[in-house]
Amino acid sequence: MYIVVTRSFPPEVGGMQNLMWGLTCSLAKYNLVKVFADFHENYKEHDQKVSFSIDRVAGIKLLRKYRKSYLVNEFIKKNKNVNCVIADHWKSLELIKTTKKKICLIHSKEINHKKGSFANRRILKAFNNIDQVVANSEYTKNLAVEIGIDENKIIVINPGVFPPKEIDKSSIKEAENLLKNKNPRLITVSRFDKRKNHEKVIMALRNLKQIYPNIIYTCIGYGEEEENVKKLTNELELNEQVIFLKNVPQGLKNALVSKSNLFVMPSIIHKTSVEGFGIAYVEAAQYGIPSIGGKDGGASDAIKNNETGIICDGNNLEEIYSSIDLILKNNSYLEM
């Protein structure tokens, strides 16, 4: 039996949630699986449909961690057939007291603390009691080694995605109506977060508009930087060139990606926040859409530079602009 301890799980929406869902479903095809996940408002309807057992843990964040660890420890004591505990965050394993094998996924942001700091010492103490570390990219592995995690414990497994589902005709039609008479078409699907770098794309769009008067940029997502990005769009008089969407059904999201020419997310490092991999690039590639990613972080594991897209310096506005222009002018990218 495998125990999965996670802070990110459906029905909550997001890249980490999709990753942990995919991992758990794949494990459950061949093994018994028990999940300990955070409470979510609509969890009952979701959890009734799955083939494995899920315990939901509610309460404020700090107490939730202790309660979840207690439940996991008690479950292991009562179930001798547990082989392994897998977690999506080192904090989820920090209080697990067992000799069973422990595996921790790492993504970069959560371990990116200065060597010797209190947070770093706490991280290293936790990883001393973890048997296997799975990094989502070479970048994340190198970061882990740099901060002091034992390299011999680390393997790199790039996150996977489920095969794309056929997009229903109504979603295709809705996407085509939203993008009608607009070309070329850029898209970003992500949280509005500083490291995602929406602002630089908007700035590049101002110049691209001079060459491509019918250009459109679709932004799907939500987050703390949303209002700042909208304000910049308004200041640069690009309201006709940018569409903001949130709470978009999966079918429409996939349709909008498939009907776009280019996925754009030239991520940067912001404080300790960094893009460890970028599953969204892979999801775009499933529909034959090239991507532009940033050189800072693990995007180069998801994008084959000058083949499936371009890796550029996300801090350099001219590089972002020229990378977008190059792909839009080069049919070999658009005919992937």
Regions inferred by a protein language model and the residue ranges of each:
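Nucleotide-activated donor-binding/catalytic signature segment of Leloir-type glycosyltransferases, i.e.
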Residues: 220, 230-251
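Conserved donor-binding/catalytic core segment of Leloir-type glycosyltransferases
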Residues: 134, 178-196, 202-205
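Conserved acidic donor-binding segment of nucleotide-sugar-dependent glycosyltransferases
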Residues: 304-306, 310-318, 325-332
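N-terminal strand-loop element at the rim of the active site
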Residues: 6-13, 19-64
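Acidic anion/phosphate-binding donor-loop and adjacent secondary structure
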Residues: 114-117, 145, 161-177
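Acidic donor-binding loop of glycosyltransferase active sites
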Residues: 258-273, 289
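Carbohydrate-associated surface elements
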Residues: 139, 160
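Short His-centered aromatic/hydrophobic patch
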Residues: 86-92
